[in-house]
Amino acid sequence: MAPRSFWKGYLKLSLVTCPVVMAPAKSEKEKLRFHTLNRATGNRVQSRYIDSVSGKPVDSADQVKGFPRDDQSYVMLEDEELDSVALESARTIDIELFAPADSIDWIWYDAPHYLTPGDEVGEEAFAVIREAMKATKMVGISRLVLYRRERAVLLEPRGKGIILWTLRYGDEVRDPKLYFDAIKDQKPVPELLSLVNRLIEERVKPWSPEMASDPVQDRLRDIIEAKKTPPAKKTKAEEKTGKGSAESNVIDIMDALRKSLGPAAKKPKGR
């Protein structure tokens, strides 16, 4: 049984339209979430919007969006004004243009979502759009309101479905030249490069989700389980001093690489 979708609408390309459903590709189900408590009482703490000058609570009906001016005052914007600049339809993914799939750098990709046909009637139109993108090695570009924000989205054919990626806005991604241009153009020593290549080859494994597991979540669960049943007698953990022999700041890269590769990486005789 497929998981429940969180969005229903239409996929449109020119005159071709079909109903679709969408669900986030990433799950927050396993992520631990905490409440803020009052240490003295153990009760939950509630947050409220307070006027920064008067200190009085502000009801939701009196809350309004504001854009700061240079003189520290604000331009107030009502909900109707914000709605006037939004998309006409928040329920239609209208593919406006296409781009070569290999022309978009991964840094623009934000969050993935699974897009599937909404019913049996729309499966044919969905398949036509999907297979056409596969055949031409193109991805579709559109706009959509998601999470209360208008987003640029990318549609990528994947298997029998389509992955819809939200994209970062143009001004959200910094120019890498600002950071990388200052790096000196150094050519590595061939022998060093050869050793690193061997080190990489020894550590190659097929991708699996375990490679991106979150050890912090597991450690937090262990702490929570331990606190549920506290030990009869508390023991004081020994503090780690962190003392040890000071390592030299200058490391012989060649020697370090040979040690990483083991006995097989020792210098041949006669060198």
Curated annotation (Swiss-Prot):
InterPro entries: Ku70/Ku80_beta-barrel_dom, Prok_Ku, SPOC-like_C_dom_sf. Pfam families: Ku. Keywords: DNA damage, DNA recombination, DNA repair, DNA-binding. Residues 225-249 are annotated as: Disordered. Residues 12-194 form the Ku domain. GO terms for molecular function: double-stranded DNA binding. GO terms for biological process: DNA recombination; double-strand break repair via nonhomologous end joining. Disulfide bonds: none annotated. Belongs to the prokaryotic Ku family. PANTHER family: NON-HOMOLOGOUS END JOINING PROTEIN KU (PTHR41251:SF1). With LigD forms a non-homologous end joining (NHEJ) DNA repair enzyme, which repairs dsDNA breaks with reduced fidelity. Binds linear dsDNA with 5'- and 3'- overhangs but not closed circular dsDNA nor ssDNA. Recruits and stimulates the ligase activity of LigD. Homodimer. Interacts with LigD. This is Non-homologous end joining protein Ku. It comes from Methylocella silvestris (strain DSM 15510 / CIP 108128 / LMG 27833 / NCIMB 13906 / BL2).
